[in-house]
Amino acid sequence: MKIMISGGGTGGHIYPALALIETLKKRHPDLQVQYIGTENGLEADLVPRAGVPFKSIQIAGLKRSLSLENVKTAYWFLKAVRALKKDMAAFKPDVVIGTGGFVSGPVVYTAQQLGIPTILHEQNSIPGLTNKFLSKKADRVALSFKGSDVHFPGANVRLIGNPRGSEVLQTEVDEASVREQYRLDDRPIVLVYGGSRGAEAINRAVVEAIPSLSELPINVLYVTGKVHFDAVSKQAPSSDNVHIHPYVYDMPSLLACTSLVISRAGASTISELTALGLPSILVPSPYVTADHQTKNASALVENGAALLVKEEALTGVTLVEAIRQALEQRDEMANASRALGFPDASDALADLVEEVIQ
């Protein structure tokens, strides 16, 4: 089996693709993969690190407002399509899979022009422009949230969940080694992170909250994002139980040892939380398309699996209050979170791949 797969920009588009690749490798030891991304996206780091063949193209996302930048984007899109036609003629993929981000646009579009079967995976409750555009000719559109089908009229949609959740469940974890790696004692771990790029608002609130967090019987593992690490390290007061890191590469292992998560409400994060049955405090990013992170979070909040703190209300004080409340309700929230998960999402997406090839 040969697959070409594309998704990039943030971990939310990349991790589901990598999880699918691992599942297909187990089923098809002779699997050949070509991953297409951009050289400046996070995929240029994560994909080769996972041992997956990677090739970059130059492309940019469309601006939603009128902009001369869109002329340049159209040029790069057409140039990428010409190059991808040659790549696909040489590689001969059985199927092309797009997991979102603007880089997947020319890849899936080219496959559709060549008559190669295509599958889209939409991680968010509200789709981005790329997947909405491509869905009209896609053979299958795999969804992560109930109710998202209304955004894909006429498409062949399947509700499967997010493969990232399956990946974290399958990770074998030695908790003692994880705690030793991050220098954590046996107190419950509260993980704070703002997604693959970090989040300034969360960083500010945590720095403000550190004196109060130091008094709680917990370990706080605080992941700033690489861009923010130096600034946060200088601002943060010292604390024996607050441990600051720029990035975590093996998030599944860390999550498996965690008692409470404080994070944005990106799609991969939601899938990880529900797969593992983790309670959470969600701070949706107000800067994303159509406020989709708030809608991602709503399913958890409405079912008692998470607490919601709007970014404009996030301070050190409100953060500590939410942590205290979540720790008191941890068992109930964990059970509610687990009930919302799709533990077999990666297998379900692999089934779709095999289905369209047959």
Curated annotation (Swiss-Prot):
Q: Name one GO cellular component term.
A: plasma membrane
The source organism is: Exiguobacterium sp. (strain ATCC BAA-1283 / AT1b)
State the annotated membrane topology for this chain.
Peripheral membrane protein
Broad EC category = transferase
Q: What is its main location?
A: membrane
User: Quick one: which pathway?
Assistant: Cell wall biogenesis; peptidoglycan biosynthesis
Q: What is this protein called?
A: UDP-N-acetylglucosamine--N-acetylmuramyl-(pentapeptide) pyrophosphoryl-undecaprenol N-acetylglucosamine transferase
Any one of the GO BP annotations: regulation of cell shape
Task: Please give the catalytic activity noted in the UniProt record.
Answer: di-trans,octa-cis-undecaprenyl diphospho-N-acetyl-alpha-D-muramoyl-L-alanyl-D-glutamyl-meso-2,6-diaminopimeloyl-D-alanyl-D-alanine + UDP-N-acetyl-alpha-D-glucosamine = di-trans,octa-cis-undecaprenyl diphospho-[N-acetyl-alpha-D-glucosaminyl-(1->4)]-N-acetyl-alpha-D-muramoyl-L-alanyl-D-glutamyl-meso-2,6-diaminopimeloyl-D-alanyl-D-alanine + UDP + H(+)
Indicate which residues the UniProt annotation says bind UDP-N-acetyl-alpha-D-glucosamine.
Answer: T10, G11, G12, N124, S196, Q293
What Gene3D superfamilies has UniProt attached to this entry? Answer: Glycogen Phosphorylase B (3.40.50.2000)
| Record InterPro entries | GlcNAc_MurG, Glyco_trans_28_C, GlycoTrans_28_N
Q: Does the keyword Cytoplasm apply?
A: no
Q: Which SUPFAM superfamilies match?
A: UDP-Glycosyltransferase/glycogen phosphorylase (SSF53756)
Task: State the family named in the UniProt similarity comment for this chain.
Answer: Belongs to the glycosyltransferase 28 family. MurG subfamily.
Q: What is its EC number?
A: 2.4.1.227
Q: What does this protein do?
A: Cell wall formation. Catalyzes the transfer of a GlcNAc subunit on undecaprenyl-pyrophosphoryl-MurNAc-pentapeptide (lipid intermediate I) to form undecaprenyl-pyrophosphoryl-MurNAc-(pentapeptide)GlcNAc (lipid intermediate II).
Q: Which gene encodes it?
A: murG
Tell where it localizes: Cell membrane
Q: Which UniProt keywords apply?
A: Cell cycle, Cell division, Cell membrane, Cell shape, Cell wall biogenesis/degradation, Glycosyltransferase, Membrane, Peptidoglycan synthesis, Transferase
A GO MF term: undecaprenyldiphospho-muramoylpentapeptide beta-N-acetylglucosaminyltransferase activity
